[in-house]
Amino acid sequence: MTTTTTQASGTAASSLAMKGVLSPVLTPFRPDLSVHKELLTAQCQWLLNCNVGLAVFGTNSEGNSLSFGERADLVQYLVAQGIDPHRMMPGTGGCALPDVVSLTQACLRAGVKDVLVLPPFYYKGVSDDGLYAFFSELIERVGDSSLRVYLYHIPPVSQIGFSMDLIEKLLNKYGPVIAGAKDSGGQ
């Protein structure tokens, strides 16, 4: 995974943003479909030892196969096991804004500042105005200037993308809180 770091209002967001290579972290499941926490922790530690950051609960991690509560608990668990919260970028996206807000706040409480956020993907044809309202509401409700949002642009899966106009509008309003984008547009 690579991210594009944004620059807003003359402030280099890159000095605040996640740096280096991040790898999707596969989520190991037990036969009963619970997450195998020990294997997840070992995989994360191995990646960190290889100087690779952690993209947990994205597409390859089956993040949307986990409940928001499971993801919040796993972030807290990983940090408690010694996984560096500054090298982790969990996917907090979803369709229900209150869930996205709650999970993002849980990440911040665990010390994780960088989050990867999908657009709300169930309803198709969402306008830039609708996406702007969603992300504005997310940022305002979270209410923490240390938050770093990476916009997850993956239209082959979500069927919704981020236009440059939308990104510019978000940057103009929220500056370094909009830290970058993960472009999985496939073009």
Language model segments and positions:
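Beta/alpha (TIM)-barrel catalytic core signal, keyed to glycine-rich beta->alpha loops juxtaposed to Asp/Glu
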Residues: 159-187
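Active-site beta->alpha loop and helix N-cap motifs at the rims of alpha/beta catalytic domains
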Residues: 2-161, 178
